């Protein structure tokens, strides 16, 4: 994958009548997979013996949860957290263009989940964190010794100077836009777009006004 702005729809486009998955290859110990589903397609319910996170990216559809087959819609920009051993299938709306989402499997037994997250209830990520005057706000959603998923809100005039991270990461713009500096080049990142940082890649974030983002970091 090139280190340039992208959308998950570009990395894993929807194909009519097909369900397709593609690994993001952030790290073997934290499987991150992009799924695209054609309109009206479905994935048979299954369960994992660990916590699973789902991030809506594009289109419309729902997750089918539990033995009672409860239908839970997931919209772009929303997070759905499922406890271990939760039976889960997916169904793309038949009257739409399809559905694209990200799956993150937390294989580690020891991790910390923010108690503002309610399992089985979709939550808009950008609504979980507020802007703080003249400041950069951080909100850890979940972290373990080999990963972190965090939200950040930048007030106007703030930003991150060039630095390096100890693992591969994907930044996703949730609101506003920013200039991403990466290894000496600048890229504009708009809401709904993502950017990959490789381990130890030199990067910076310069918001163009107020800006919210998520960051998924995998350390191996």
What are the residue ranges of the model-derived segments?
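A short, N-terminal "cap"/entry segment at the start of jelly-roll beta-barrel domains
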Residues: 1-31, 75-76, 80, 94-146
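Short strand-coil-strand connectors
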Residues: 28, 66-68, 181-185, 208
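Ligand-binding loop in jelly-roll beta-barrel domains
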Residues: 84-110, 199-220
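Conserved short histidine dyad/triad with adjacent acidic residue
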Residues: 16-20, 31-48, 134-138, 147-165, ...
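Surface-exposed loop/turn positions
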Residues: 28, 41, 78, 86, ...
């Amino acid at each position: 994958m090139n280190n340039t702005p992208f959308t998950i729809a570009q990395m894993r486009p929807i194909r009519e009548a097909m369900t397709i998955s593609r690994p993001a290859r952030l790290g073997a110990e934290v499987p991150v997979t992009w799924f695209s589903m054609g309109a009206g397609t479905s994935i048979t319910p299954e369960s994992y013996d660990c916590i699973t996170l789902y991030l809506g990216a594009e289109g419309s559809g729902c997750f089918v949860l539990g033995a009672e087959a409860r239908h839970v819609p997931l919209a772009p920009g929303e997070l759905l957290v499922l406890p271990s051993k939760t039976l889960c299938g997916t169904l793309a709306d038949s009257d739409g263009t399809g559905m694209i989402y990200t799956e993150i499997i937390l294989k580690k037994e020891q991790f910390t989940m923010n108690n503002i997250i309610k399992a089985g209830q979709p939550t808009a990520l950008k609504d979980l964190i507020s802007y703080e005057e003249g400041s950069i706000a951080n909100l850890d959603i979940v972290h373990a010794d080999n990963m972190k998923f965090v939200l950040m809100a930048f007030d106007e005039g703030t930003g991150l100077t060039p630095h390096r991270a100890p693992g591969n990461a994907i930044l996703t713009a949730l609101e506003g836009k920013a200039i991403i500096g990466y290894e000496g080049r600048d890229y504009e990142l708009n809401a709904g777009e993502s950017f990959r940082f490789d381990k130890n890649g030199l990067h910076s974030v310069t918001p163009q006004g107020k800006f919210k983002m998520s960051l998924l970091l995998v350390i191996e």
